[in-house]
Amino acid sequence: MLGGRHSHWSPQDLEEQAFSPYGTFPPSPTESTETSSSISSTRPRVNPRIVSDAILGLSDGLTVPFALSAGLSALGNSRVVVVGGLAELVAGAISMGLGGYVGSRSEVESYEATVRETKHLVKASPMETMNIIHQVFAPYNLPEEPVARMSHILYNSPEKLLDFLLTFYHKESKPGCHQAWISAITLALGYFIGGFIPLIPYFMVDQVLVALYYSIGIMIFTLLVFGYVKTCVVRGWTGKENIVAGIKGGLQMVVVGGLAAGASIALARAINPTGGALF
């Protein structure tokens, strides 16, 4: 079936190996040593969802508040820029945080609904469940006998069967219990930190036009660095292609931020050409 030297394996052996995280058959001593050394040398990795939320929050924070502060600077009053910018920062951070929380809660609810439907399917339709298991193994062109035995083992273990269907058929992973709050806080902080950077010159310089120039210079550098880092986090840091892609990502962020700021300034000047008080 699976080779002569494995013909003495019992169903219990197959069941244990089916859920082994690193392979179907027991590793050799050399493989075990290599696996142990690779695991011990692996550094802890940041949750990809946290990285994604941080990038999203910073990306919006570096663009929208900068465009708003640049537009408000056309009014010629640094106090208006600071107050309006801070108000937008707080409102935007709260909005981003709530959006992240609601989105994560929706993922949890979707996962729980999938779990309920799968449990009902297992209890109500044994034959359909067995067919689904065979569908999962079908792309691998495995012999029928081991697939049938594995299906039987899975069906006799409800918890493992549920986990198998969720992972390999529905392709769903259980969300973290605190993921909604972590996502909300990460998005809100990313937005606030990113949006506060272009406001810094307005706290230090009294002349609005000078502060605007400082803000533009700071944001060009910040957007360039952020775009480069954001791209290289996804693609990698080494290699000519990755470096070129990182530079392109930085330039794209500068172009997007510049267009948003330019549109905001143009709109403010169109509404208030003199730069005086509106009311």
Curated annotation (Swiss-Prot):
Low complexity bias (residue ranges): 30-44
Function comment: Vacuolar iron transporter involved in the transfer of iron from the cytosol to the vacuole for intracellular iron storage. Plays an essential role in iron detoxification during high iron conditions.
One GO BP annotation of this record: intracellular manganese ion homeostasis
Organism this protein belongs to: Arthroderma benhamiae (strain ATCC MYA-4681 / CBS 112371)
GO CC entries: vacuolar membrane
Lineage of the species this protein comes from: Eukaryota, Fungi, Dikarya, Ascomycota, Pezizomycotina
Pfam families per record: VIT1
Similarity-based family: Belongs to the CCC1 family.
Protein known as: Vacuolar iron transporter cccA
CDD domains in UniProt: CCC1 (cd02435)
Keywords carried by this UniProt record: Ion transport, Iron, Iron transport, Membrane, Transmembrane, Transmembrane helix, Transport, Vacuole
Region (Disordered): 1-44
